Amino acid sequence: MTRKKVREHLFKMLFLLDFYPKTELDDQVSTYLSDIGNDADAAEETQERLEKVREELKQKFYAVAEHLEEIDRKIEEKSNGWSLKRLAKADITALRLAIYEIQYDEDVPAGVAVNESVELAKVYGTDKSPAFVKGVLGSVVRDGAEE
């Protein structure tokens, strides 16, 4: 499974954050993870590789959830007066994923995090989502470079 596909699975998992109470998230994550491997993209994967992917997704999902308040504050700060309530859920999810990768995941270069989140916004967001996501993330990256 490609890194891009793994990131897309993480995006879909993170999308759950706004639709389920915290008490149900563990069950929702388990259900989602158990379905990985049942699609055509994973048909060629070994069970060992699928287990590694599932574990990585689970770890990253909970890492994002742990930093969610900080990440959401950063989104509101950088989205020029737009509250999270006014933003499209797909845009919020793409931003959460990228900001997590930029600020907390040393294995992902900032440019890759930005580009991949813009691509996710193209697929799952509105026509205006890619430009919005790129603008917010550009501001986040610039701030990080200044620190």
Residue ranges of each PLM-predicted region?
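N-terminal interaction/assembly modules
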Residues: 1-130, 134-147
